Amino acid sequence: MTCRQSAVRVVGLALVLGLFLLESRVVAAGDRKVLRPRVPPDQIETARAVKNPLPATPELIEKGKALYHGKAFCLTCHGRDGKGLGRDVDPKLVQGVLPRNFTERAWQKARTDGELMWVLKNGIPGTAMAVFVGPVVTEEEAWQLILYVRSFGPSP
């Protein structure tokens, strides 16, 4: 192998390594954004302390599913499978935050039921996530929705 061939090989490997590292940083940055709490810092501890008063029974999860697919129209944005790409979502046209992917293990682990309830009660400014508790569902129905959303996550 000539000196020139060695230099080309080294440069090629450096480019591949550089692209790999850049991609890793982009993925890591995306993960941090996914895990960023949507509850304001001055309310986060209070929200995290709130527990779902309903047990995760098959009947209540099924009620949450009926709400998700019906009255609360969650599937429109979050999709039937909870992956955040509902029928009204075109990722190429969305500016800013895409609808939450409820199947992400890290997100399921990081967010508490109380934080999810806070979002349902307050919406998320700057996104399409509106206030749902009150205008669309009752608080009890919101807890049922949360039980169903948890069913998209990995089994404990």
Task: List each model region and its residues.
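Sec/Tat signal peptide C-region and signal peptidase I cleavage site
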Residues: 23-28
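Cleaved targeting-peptide boundary
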Residues: 29-36
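Bacterial N-terminal signal peptides that target proteins for export
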Residues: 2-12
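Sequence/structural segment immediately N-terminal to covalent heme-attachment motifs in c-type
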Residues: 58-80, 88-91
